[in-house]
Amino acid sequence: MIKINNVKDVFLCLLFFAFHCAGQSNDSRKFEDIISDAVIEVPSAELTDSDFFKSVDDLTIIHSYQVQEQIDWYLGYDYAGTVTAFERSQKYIPAIENIFEQEKDLPSELIYLPILESGFSPVAVSKSNAKGLWQFVSVTAEELDLMDDSYVDERNDIRKSTKAAVRHLKYLYSVFKNWEFALAAYNGGAGYVRSVMSKNPGMNYWQLAEANKFKRETALYVPRFAALLIIQKHLKSTTIYPKLSDLKYNYMKVTIETPATISDISKSFGISEKKIREFNPQLKGNVIPPYYKTYSLLIPNSESIAMLN
């Protein structure tokens, strides 16, 4: 029997077995079975929600079997989807990272939440009609002053939706005072999480999830995010990393005088209309919203344009 008392050693063992079955669709064994086959003895620990991001960073959160299962899912059964999401993240993270850098009281790790929410697709649409990188439903978008009319849907706007997400996350944290509940509320709604908490006083997020007090999606939301953060933090050690392209995107925020069309902008900047739409997916048609005197767009800089072309 292999006895492991160091949390980081536990993590490395978990990754070894996860990577072993990554992308192998013919291996139907569950992650816990693979671990059991290796006869690894993991020390027990009580998870608290005192500092979610610290527990991810120092890997103590690995003691949660829910997190272990989600690492297995992302590096095993959903391996192709995970690779795609991390590939997309390279394209859009530079655009949202700058916004988070201005928010000193928000954990920087939150820039990776769109991997969970949308697979980092700014045009993603859920079954509940939530849209964009940050997956806002229309009611929440309206509360956050994101416009949706015949010209734009700002839920798909990379910068504006990110600024709205920052406001929303700050609000949720101010309500719940810890990130497990704030993240659960981002998924299930603040009212829903308050209701579950009021019916089960004194229980933390992990206890509520373990006791099936949350609906399944909300119970899995925090473990899934933790798993993705761990993968991201150790990305170079994964089999995902060699599959990612070397492209690095940098952007300019350009101000356009209206009236203007995407066709006009394409000619002015020497970038295809397709690429303009890719970085400004909020635009519904060819016409820039005419009710603004000027309008800001996200355009790759000259070096990025050269790589794209």
Locations of the language-model features?
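Extracellular LysM carbohydrate-binding repeats and other cell-envelope/extracellular binding modules
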Residues: 279-309
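Bacterial Sec-dependent N-terminal signal peptides
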Residues: 1-29
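An acidic, Gly/Ser/Thr/Pro-rich helix-cap/linker signature
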Residues: 21-104
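Secretory-pathway/luminal and periplasmic proteins that interact with or process carbohydrate-rich
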Residues: 119-127, 143, 172-175, 190-202, ...
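LysM (lysin motif) carbohydrate-binding repeats in extracellular/periplasmic proteins that recognize
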Residues: 261-290
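Short, functionally critical alpha-helical segments immediately adjacent to catalytic or ligand/cofactor-binding
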Residues: 106-122, 182-187, 276-280
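Substrate-binding/active-site groove segments that recognize
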Residues: 128-149, 162-165, 193-196
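Primarily a LysM-type cell-wall glycan-binding module
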Residues: 243-270
